[in-house]
Each structure stands twice: as structure tokens, then as C-alpha cells.
Amino acid sequence: MKEPDAIKLFVGQIPRHLEEKDLKPIFEQFGRIFELTVIKDKYTGLHKGCAFLTYCARDSALKAQSALHEQKTLPGMNRPIQVKPADSESRGDRKLFVGMLGKQQTDEDVRKMFEPFGTIDECTVLRGPDGTSKGCAFVKFQTHAEAQAAINTLHSSRTLPGASSSLVVKFADTEKERGLRRMQQVATQLGMFSPIALQFGAYSAYTQALMQQQAALVAAHSAYLSPMATMAAVQMQHMAAISANGLIATPITPSSGTSTPPAIAATPVSAIPAALGVNGYSPVPTQPTGQPAPDALYPNGVHPYPAQSPAAPVDPLQQAYAGMQHYTAAYPAAYSLVAPAFPQPPALVAQQPPPPPQQQQQQQQQQQQQQQQREGPDGCNIFIYHLPQEFTDSEILQMFVPFGHVISAKVFVDRATNQSKCFGFVSFDNPASAQAAIQAMNGFQIGMKRLKVQLKRPKDANRPY
């Protein structure tokens, strides 16, 4: 039976061929094991070289940590084993955030409110520079069970005098959660993250790809809209109009049996709102047929593609998928889930015969060269140091996409342990995006560290001539 205050341990630096039955003899000498689980990739099922361990008794966990952490190196590993409380324990589900307090309540008032649930290590009401209460506090118990009991009893249980809503009691955020939230706030201030893209994931990949084009334009601080940028903006307006009517809110799955969700079928084209102007340009007026007015003026001479008339209905999701094809080569992992969700359009022309072997070989060589070209031009590649240990390629891609079109984003990983080295690189397709990323993210704090973002030196920078 597990004790209420038992500690969940994270075990790292273990060989990938060792399963639970192989690891148990190492840890059973310190006490009875309640649960031991090797962590595996949820998609591939591959061993990740780490595990979670929970003893029945708290003392057993402390003994194991004291005897093994950084003390013993398992066969086949270059670094000693890591045994420490898991993230949820170290933060550790003992510290509570208390919101919607009255402005007049003191530390002692809050302590009296929470004392019935256990021993309190810390109790602090947050105050501004002038000493005025911010209406919230942090309370830290000795055990997770005590903190959980306080949440179960007090959360939303009452409205305190001077508060505008019921009492809020929840576990405090981790450093990682606060860091990610600040990154999202920075991106929101830059006006480059789409809430639609963040909410609907793979179904909005087309929108995210178009946003990269717009982000690069913003990073360059250019007031002139090029024809290609104007086209991207018009396309983004079209997608925003579709999303505003809830057309992307219903996921399409292969089992649904239809390529058009009910929201699309029930929404007439005339109900789609007019798109907003781009950088001061007014939206192009349209006739009832869906075609642009004959006297309309277009920025840079680029005609926006109008919504389809009722006489020729086209699935807007299928349009999005068709327009997304040329982005899939750059980010295959990001779009791998999209293809099954969108049915393939019917062939409009007869199937072409396969190219001759010589042409196939040339195409394969070109594809290999494109895959090998991971870096952008000189002045477009940046290094990022002091990354959190848990950050992967997808996290730094999400972090730097707002600044422009990303060619590649990579976190360096130790080949022996498959653990992050806490630094990586990002390549853009233009210097302006790289400089904008450096200015915004260099010195950005995540947890206890600040990111160091700098430009990679050109290949010939060290040459004396």
C-alpha cells in the first residue's frame, strides 16, 4: 500500500534495452516498489532511456535518491544515473495558488484559512510596490495530500468580502509553464500567432504556413506590399472568413464518411463575411455572383480569388489542402496527420505515365540535395543557447515561426543518451527575420535561465583574406 506522501521519482540515463523487469533488482534494495514504468514514445513505442518510479514508502524514495543519483553509471552509458523527484513532485503539487482574495486579507488570515488541512511551510500574499495586496497568494504545504485536500474543500466554495468572484485554489504553475506562457505573450504582442492555428493544430497548417510569409514581411518593417505578400494576405483573409463561420471547428476523420462537415453544407457562401483590409487596403467589393466588381482597384495588380458562386460549389477545406501541398516538404512531421483527414480530390486529367528511369534518378538527386540543404543563406542562421532540457525541435520551431519563414529548426541531442544538449539552431530564408528573432528573443528568460540568441558566423569569417 502506498503512503499518502510517497514521492514519484524520475529515473534518467538508463540503457534503452532495459525494461521494468531488468530495472527492478536495482531499486528493490531500497524498499518495496509500488510502480515502475519505463517511458516510451507514444507514437513509435521506442524506449526513451528514462522511467518513473514510485515506492510504497517515502523513506525508500529518499534512500534511493541519496544512494544512486549521480553516483552510479549503468553499463553502456556515459553519464551516471539520474534519480530525482518528478516534475510534479519537485514543484511539487504542494504549492498552491490562491486567487480572488479580499484586498484587506493578510498573510495571517490566509494561513488560518488553510491550517485545518495540514502543516504550512510558506504563506505569502502578493503585494505591489506600494504594499497593496494583489488579491492573490501562494500557500505551500508539506505534502501533496494536504494540498489536494485544500483544493477539494476550498476551491469555488465561497466568495470573500471585497472579491469579485468565488475563491480560486489550484496548484501553482511550474517554471516551464510560466516560460511557455511568456513566450506566447511575446508572440501575441507581435501580432503573429493565430489563435485558430494554435487551437486546431494540423487542420490549420495551411493558415500557419501563410502566416510565416506575413511574419517575414512584418519582420522586415516594410511598408510596401509586394505582389506575393499581397496574395498571401488575400489567402489568409479567405481562410479567416471560413474559420469565423466555424467551418474548421469540426474535425474531419476518415470514418466520418464525408468530405464536407454539416457546418460547411449548411453555410451559404453569401454568409461568409467580407475580409478585412490589409495594411490599409480596403477589401475588394464583390457582386452577388461572387465575382469582383469591374471597376475595383487591386493592390499591386493582384486579383484576389473570390468565393465560389453557388452554381459551382467547392469544398473550402479541400481548397486549403490543395494550397498546402508545397509546404509539406519543409515540415513533413507537422503535416503527416493532415493528409488522412482530407480526402484526395478527383483526378481532372488522365494519369500520366511514370517518367523514364534517368529522369527519376535526377528527381531523387534533387530531392536529396534539398533535404541536405538545412541551412539558410549567410546572415540567416541563428544559434540558441540555454534551452530547457525538455525542449524539442517542435518547441523551438513554434518559438521562432512568428519571425519569418523557417527553413529548419533543430535541437542538438547527445547521440549516446538521446538527451538534449540544451542548444540548437534555426535557419530563416532572409536576414531580416533572423535579426528580428535575435532582438526579440536574446535574453528571454525561461525558468532560471535566459536564452542566448546570436547569429551564426559566415563560413568564410575566419579566413584572413
Swiss-Prot record:
CDD domains: RRM1_CELF3_4_5_6 (cd12632), RRM2_CELF3_4_5_6 (cd12635), RRM3_CELF3_4_5_6 (cd12639). GO terms for biological process: flagellated sperm motility; lncRNA transcription; mRNA processing; nuclear body organization; positive regulation of mRNA splicing, via spliceosome; regulation of alternative mRNA splicing, via spliceosome; RNA splicing; spermatogenesis. Residues 345-358 have a biased composition (Pro residues). It is found in: Nucleus; Cytoplasm. GO terms for molecular function: 7SK snRNA binding; RNA binding. GO terms for cellular component: cytoplasm; nuclear body; nucleus. Residues 359-373 have a biased composition (Low complexity). Residues 283-311, 345-379 are annotated as: Disordered. Keywords: Activator, Cytoplasm, mRNA processing, mRNA splicing, Nucleus, Repeat, RNA-binding. PROSITE patterns: RRM (PS50102). Residues 7-88, 95-174, 380-458 form the RRM domain. Belongs to the CELF/BRUNOL family. This is CUGBP Elav-like family member 3.
